[in-house]
Curated annotation (Swiss-Prot):
Main function: Plays a role in autophagy. Functions at the preautophagosomal structure (PAS) in order to form normal autophagosomes under starvation conditions. Also plays a role in mitophagy and regulation of filamentous growth.
Basic and acidic residues bias: start-end ranges: 134-147
A Pfam family hit: ATG29_N
Gene Ontology CC annotations of this record: Atg1/ULK1 kinase complex; phagophore assembly site
Keyword Transcription carried by entry: no
Listed name of the protein: Autophagy-related protein 29
Highest taxon, organism lineage: Eukaryota
Subcellular localization, as worded in the UniProt entry: Preautophagosomal structure
Chief localisation class: other
The entry's keywords: Autophagy, Protein transport, Transport
Name of encoding gene: ATG29
InterPro entries membership: ATG29 (IPR039113), Atg29_N (IPR040666), ATG29_sf (IPR039362)
Entry GO MF terms: SNARE binding
Organism of provenance: Candida glabrata (strain ATCC 2001 / BCRC 20586 / JCM 3761 / NBRC 0622 / NRRL Y-65 / CBS 138)
Protein family per UniProt: Belongs to the ATG29 family.
Length: 217
């Protein structure tokens, strides 16, 4: 019982106005309510008017009551229709907002899986790669090459020479030895010094280049 489905009649004492007729007594139930709505929902022509007298006779209810019930039924069903439309619009917006998030989550998952498949590079492996790129191409041949270069340097004219011309502290002694040696062989001292100087210069630069080439520097 509430204010929407309850009607209160108040009887006031006094003289009845002229032409006043007591409302007829009738019975209204859910079956008549459904029948009324089925007739109203099938009205397709908006210009066609409802025959209220015929409708009142068929439902055994007064016309004023049927008009009021029609208004209440239309209001109720329009409200239900509005709620359904709002619910569908809300669901559509929810689906649209969830779709991009789902796609972005799948992309992030693919990127993480790809990064997990990459080989792990530690500082040790990076240093090894650097040494391989910048070191000698053939590490096994490096000791042999160095040994050969040293042997060639030992057997060269510079290391086997009796006098050490590069020793500037004993420069005079060395020159004396050179002079005595070449005098015995009958070679002039000044010519010997110039030839020796040029020979030593060429031999030194040549050996340096050969040594650098062998060591792959």
């Amino acid at each position: 019982m509430n204010s929407k489905n309850t009607i209160v009649y108040v009887k006031v004492k006094g003289k009845r106005p002229d032409g006043f007729v007591d409302p007829p007594v009738f019975e209204w139930n859910i079956q008549k309510e459904k029948k009324l709505w089925s007739l109203l929902s099938q009205l397709n022509d908006p210009d066609k008017e409802i025959d209220w007298a015929l409708l009142a006779e068929g439902l055994d209810a007064p016309i004023y009551f049927l008009k009021r019930r029609c208004y209440e039924l239309f209001t109720k069903h329009f409200e239900l229709l509005r709620q359904q439309i709002d619910r569908k619009n809300k669901n559509a917006l929810t689906d649209r907002s969830e779709t991009p998030e789902r796609d972005s989550t799948e992309e992030i998952t693919k990127e993480v899986n790809f990064l997990n498949q990459l080989p792990v590079r530690t500082p040790g492996t990076i240093q090894e790669e650097f040494n391989e790129d910048n070191g000698p191409k053939d590490k096994n041949k490096t000791p042999d090459t160095t040994k050969k270069a040293i042997e060639q340097l030992k057997s060269s004219r510079i290391l086997n020479f009796k006098g050490n011309k590069l020793d500037y502290n004993n420069r005079e002694v060395g020159l004396t030895r050179y002079d005595s040696t070449y005098e015995k062989e009958g070679v002039h001292t000044e010519e010997t010094e110039s030839e020796l100087s040029s020979s030593l210069g060429v031999s030194k630069s040549t050996l340096e280049e050969a040594l650098m080439d062998k060591l792959q520097i």
